[in-house]
């Protein structure tokens, strides 16, 4: 029970930090469109999540929960991504919306793969 409580607290703390950072970054990037800011933040979270996955066996479970589930989960947001795609589609049409969706998913996957590769590369050098 203590292990689960510690994991829950780690997720809570990481989520709080990630969510606040996301909000701060949103305010710091006022010149960017809403879709561009969300895109950048989500891609950064995908990269970090891939890196954490690669080094997960070296991390205490609470630290992994804090970083992966909490921080990355709080930093990135699927709901904002979908809402912004909906708004983009309504303003600019389905082809633009589908293109943006495809690009963000592909970039997120590429970022996660790159983060994991860099994490594994670091592990190999140890």
Curated annotation (Swiss-Prot):
<feature type="transmembrane region" description="Helical">
    <location>
        <begin position="9"/>
        <end position="29"/>
    </location>
</feature>
<dbReference type="GO" id="GO:0062054">
    <property type="term" value="F:fluoride channel activity"/>
</dbReference>
<dbReference type="InterPro" id="IPR003691">
    <property type="entry name" value="FluC"/>
</dbReference>
<keyword id="KW-0997">Cell inner membrane</keyword>
<feature type="transmembrane region" description="Helical">
    <location>
        <begin position="35"/>
        <end position="55"/>
    </location>
</feature>
<protein>
    <recommendedName>
        <fullName>Fluoride-specific ion channel FluC</fullName>
    </recommendedName>
</protein>
<feature type="transmembrane region" description="Helical">
    <location>
        <begin position="94"/>
        <end position="114"/>
    </location>
</feature>
<keyword id="KW-0472">Membrane</keyword>
<keyword id="KW-0812">Transmembrane</keyword>
<dbReference type="GO" id="GO:0005886">
    <property type="term" value="C:plasma membrane"/>
</dbReference>
<dbReference type="GO" id="GO:0140114">
    <property type="term" value="P:cellular detoxification of fluoride"/>
</dbReference>
<keyword id="KW-0813">Transport</keyword>
<keyword id="KW-0915">Sodium</keyword>
<keyword id="KW-0406">Ion transport</keyword>
<dbReference type="GO" id="GO:0046872">
    <property type="term" value="F:metal ion binding"/>
</dbReference>
<keyword id="KW-0614">Plasmid</keyword>
<comment type="similarity">
    <text>Belongs to the fluoride channel Fluc/FEX (TC 1.A.43) family.</text>
</comment>
<feature type="transmembrane region" description="Helical">
    <location>
        <begin position="63"/>
        <end position="83"/>
    </location>
</feature>
<dbReference type="Pfam" id="PF02537">
    <property type="entry name" value="CRCB"/>
</dbReference>
<keyword id="KW-0407">Ion channel</keyword>
<keyword id="KW-0479">Metal-binding</keyword>
<feature type="binding site">
    <location>
        <position position="73"/>
    </location>
    <ligand>
        <name>Na(+)</name>
    </ligand>
</feature>
<keyword id="KW-1133">Transmembrane helix</keyword>
<feature type="binding site">
    <location>
        <position position="76"/>
    </location>
    <ligand>
        <name>Na(+)</name>
    </ligand>
</feature>
<keyword id="KW-1003">Cell membrane</keyword>
<comment type="function">
    <text>Fluoride-specific ion channel. Important for reducing fluoride concentration in the cell, thus reducing its toxicity.</text>
</comment>
